[in-house]
Amino acid sequence: MAQYFGFIPSDKLNDMINEAERIINSNEQVDYYPYRNELTQQIARELIDNLLVGLIDVIPNPERQAAMGKIVNTIERTTETLLNVLLGKDKNEDIIPSFEFLKNESMFLDNDGERRVGFKLSDRAAQTINEGYAAVTPDNVDLVKFKAALETMNEVALTHFITRFTETLKLGMIKRGSIPVAKAGIDKGMSLALNKLLPQLPDAGLNRLAGFYRPFFIEKAE
């Protein structure tokens, strides 16, 4: 069995994926870069929506909800700015590696045959995440293990969708050098969100949080 992380794309994102596949597979004589750029931006938006926006509803205090909302907005703006800088008007042959990465390494079918946007987890990451969620029960919560699971989830998602994806882009030294800086900023924002959120929640709230995230993790036969 293999462990995967993935979210169910919106109808809009599904349509964008299907359209990009159709254009590539039919060798349609159009510029590919607008499809790559729009698809990448939409995946980023939905990834943030699934991982972070839902957290706001878990917070019981309205003032803290507002503070969390500001953190999430900062992450959204940073991500959008990074992608606007990196995604340019590339030649079609330079777009293909990005499409192949998104299609072959960033999507999978879950056990119900439904498309998800995500990726296979390493054994080590899967173990940390599984142990963290198993440590959250109605009777007891091991906050250290649960926090480690959430941090691992964020790190592997950032590594896949920022570090590995941008390796498929044809970039100059300056643009490529901006990627680790932007990734560190996004990672800092996500860590800040967790550090603000977790101490506020009683065990019941931590169980709700774990319940919110569990559906993103899929175990399926290889």
What role is predicted for each listed range?
Residues 1-222:
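Protein-protein interaction and targeting regions used for scaffolding, dimerization, and localization
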